[in-house]
Structure formats: C-alpha cells, structure tokens
UniProtKB/Swiss-Prot annotation:
Protein name from the UniProt record: Uncharacterized protein RC1023
Keywords: Signal
Lineage: Bacteria, Pseudomonadati, Pseudomonadota, Alphaproteobacteria, Rickettsiales
Signal peptide boundaries: 1-19
A Pfam family annotated for this UniProt entry: SurA_N_3
PANTHER family: CHAPERONE SURA
Species assigned in the record: Rickettsia conorii (strain ATCC VR-613 / Malish 7)
SUPFAM superfamilies in UniProt: Triger factor/SurA peptide-binding domain-like (SSF109998)
Transmembrane segments annotated in the record for this chain: none
Origin superkingdom: Bacteria
Length: 295
C-alpha cells in the first residue's frame, strides 16, 4: 500500500511538472512577456499559415519563432517609447495585407477570431512592423549611392557593354631585371593623367587603347573588367614580355533612366537593410533578455 501511494505521488508530481509553465516566459529589460502572450502568438502564427497540427519538432520551432518575435516586438516598443502608432496606419496596414491576399476589407480580423486567435496579438505585431518601417525610413535619409557604386553594380550584372580607355605598358624584354622594373612601375601608377614618359621609357612602351569591353581579347578582358578607373593591374607575362594595364575610364553603354533608377533603388535598399540589421543586432546585444521558458 505504501509503495502504491509512492508511485501515485511520483506520477502526479511528474504530470504537474510537465503541464505547468511559468506565467512569465521571458523579460526584456525587465518588461515581461507573459505565457498568455506567448500562446496567443503561437496560435496566431498557426492561423495565418493555415496550420492545424504540429509534430513535437515543429512545435519546438514554432515556440522559438513566437518567442523571438515577441522579444523583437518588445525591443521595438521600448525603442519607440511614448510614440503612438496612429490607428489609421494600423488599419491601412491590415487593408494592405488583405489586398495582397485578395481578401475583403475587414475579413482578416474576423478570420483570426474564427480560429480563436486574439486579434490583439496580431495588431501588436502590426504595430511593431510599423515601428520598424519608421526606423527604415529614417535610415534611408542617411544613405547615399555614388555613381561609382552604380557602375560597379551594372558591370557585375554582365548585361551592358562598356567602353574602356586604358594605358597598356609592355616591357622591352622578358628578363628578371625587366620584371623588377615593371613591378616598381606598377607601384608608381596612380592616375592616367599623371603618367609621364620618364616613368617607363627606359624599359617599357605604352599604348593607349579605347575599345568596347566585349571586343577586348579574353585574358585582358577579364583583367580589365575587375579594375576600377585609375587602378593598375598586376604584372602579367604576355608573349615572353611583361605587361601592366592601367584603366583610365569606363563608360557603360546604353543604360536608360529606368535601368539606372532600378540599380539605385536596389543599392539603396541594400544599404538600408544592412544598417537596420546592424542596429537591431546592437539593440539585442545591449538589452537584458531573460528567457524563462523551458527549452
């Protein structure tokens, strides 16, 4: 009898331990994230992704995702402080989601309610996304894209031909002394406009070439493509002599305004994204985040 009572007691204790979860699952700078918020977020994610049931492994992934989103949300709300998100912006964001999913206006919240999801969890996430968008908007004002960056991006796409102007230096012989002299010359080549005949005349010749990149022969085309204006190549052996190419200019041909704007927008968004990612990473590093949810 005593043994039976012990077994019942152990079994009961085990089940209580398994079933119970702390009322606070995490805290962010002493701001609590409650168990109810955590469960509501999980339920919301399942509803929005039309998921009915989960394996234990999937449930673990969902728990991690829900907790991360709540922590990020808390950080964003703390960053925003007392600044309120206007109700009109929230409603417009919900309408935008409904439009993308071809849903009648007002039906999204009704759908969530029909899945027993607390709409407050969804609206809270909408608010945090709007705060994030405001941050991205403010970051965009500090982002600039140079013409050089635009040219590099277009060149790397291999979609447009380029007119290249370059100075090609060729040694007069192929000996070790000539190789040393050419290496010394390479280190002194800074700008095409500053090149003087006295720099190379004793041991090399110089030829100015202007042509389309597509018409330059194989190996030299590869070398030139990777060089920026006023940048000299390494010393290469060509036909038993040594050669250096100094690019003077690159002019991309046949780029219209729409193509140029597309590249500018792409590079701008990339820079904003990189800045935002760094900002959010720093925000997380500086925050006091405690997770009480059992792993």
């Amino acid at each position: 009898m005593r043994k039976l009572l012990l077994i019942i007691t152990v079994f009961f204790t085990f089940n209580v331990a398994q079933a119970s979860l702390p009322n606070i699952v995490a805290s962010v700078n002493d701001e609590p994230i409650t168990l109810n918020e955590f469960r509501a977020r999980k339920k919301m994610i399942m509803a929005l992704n039309n998921v009915e049931s989960l394996t234990p492994a999937q449930d673990k992934q969902l728990s991690d995702l829900a907790l991360k989103s709540l922590i990020d949300e808390s950080l964003l709300f703390q960053y925003a402080g007392d600044r309120e998100i206007p109700q009109e912006e929230i409603e417009n964001a919900i309408k935008s989601i409904e439009d993308r999913n071809k849903m009648p206006h007002g039906s999204l919240l009704q759908y969530l309610k029909s899945r027993s999801v607390n709409p407050d969890s969804f609206i809270s996430q909408i608010k945090s996304e709007l705060i994030k968008m405001n941050i991205l908007s403010s970051l965009s004002r500090s982002v600039q894209v140079s013409n050089k960056e635009i040219d590099v991006a277009i060149l790397s796409s291999d979609q447009k031909d380029v007119e290249i102007s370059m100075q090609v230096f060729t040694s007069k012989d192929g000996g070790n002394k000539a190789f040393t002299q050419m290496n010394n010359l390479k280190n002194r080549l800074k700008k095409c406009a500053d090149v003087k005949k006295s720099l190379y005349d004793n041991f090399a010749t110089m030829q100015i070439i202007t042509d389309k990149l597509s018409k330059i022969e194989g190996v030299k085309q590869t070398i030139v493509k990777d060089l920026t204006p006023d940048k000299a190549s390494n010393v290469f052996e060509v036909n038993n002599k040594f050669e250096i190419t100094l690019v003077c200019s690159k002019k991309i041909l046949n780029v219209n305004e729409d193509e140029n704007n597309y590249v500018v927008n792409f590079l701008t968004n990339k820079k904003i994204s990189q800045k935002a990612q760094k900002m959010f990473e720093n925000m997380r590093k500086k925050a006091a985040i405690k997770i009480m949810l059992p792993s």
